[in-house]
Amino acid sequence: MTSSLVGSEMCIRDRYNFDQVGEKDMYLLHHEEIESLAKNIPGVKRIRFFMTFGQSYLTHMKCLEDVGMLRTDPIMVDGKEVVPLQVLKELLPDPASLGPRTVGKTNIGCIFNGIKDGKKKSIYIYNVCDHQECYKEVESQAVSYTTGVPAMIGSMMVVTGLWKKPGVFNLEEMDPDPYMEALNKFGLPWKVVENPVSVDCYKTADPSVHMD
């Protein structure tokens, strides 16, 4: 993921105005969730996953890449074998310690474009989560909160029998209604906006590569 971002002139990206967060540059990435969604949602034609990164983050990653600190292959240092990326991991602060000083909000959502009742329809469903509010509740920032709460709800669906059938399944193969209702109840309320601003999935720095 990192190496595809640091060479930003080659990236597929767009700038989007996120509710309560503001305008951010977001980059097209691969994510493992796409694999099962494409398989399990009937009729889906295209799925794209975007994530935002600040310029400071990208600059730091580019510098680290330039000096070899993002390498995952072992090198010899004073007769000992070390992996640069593992060394960097040890030098960075424990992510759990960042909660008290992480401020701002996350905006996580999906834009759906399709046909309903013979007509084109577009909706944007999303959640906004505050880092400091999350820390007050569970002593963790919003990134961990928005990861842990959905997993908890999924477990609850299984334990209570709301999701129950033999075999192994991904979340999108189960009844979404009780899950979505539980998100509202357990700290991740969501909103729906009709006809949102669309995302240009193919915008690049190269004007010759551009498709709406």
What does each model-identified segment do?
Residues 1-7, 12:
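Single conserved hydrophobic/aromatic residue that forms the stacking wall/gate
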Residues 2-3, 21, 138-139:
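Short coil/turn segments at secondary-structure junctions
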Residues 15-16, 157:
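Short, flexible, solvent-exposed loop/turn segments with mixed acidic/basic and small polar residues
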Residues 16-23:
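Flexible glycine/proline-enriched surface loops and loop-helix/loop-strand junctions
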Residues 22, 29-46:
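A conserved active-site cap/scaffold subdomain adjacent to cofactor or substrate pockets
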Residues 23-27, 141-144:
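Hydrophobic alpha-helical scaffolding
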Residues 36, 57, 70-212:
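C-terminal helical cap and adjacent loop that interface with cofactors, partners, or active-site loops
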Residues 44-52, 60-79:
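Oxyanion-binding "anion nests"
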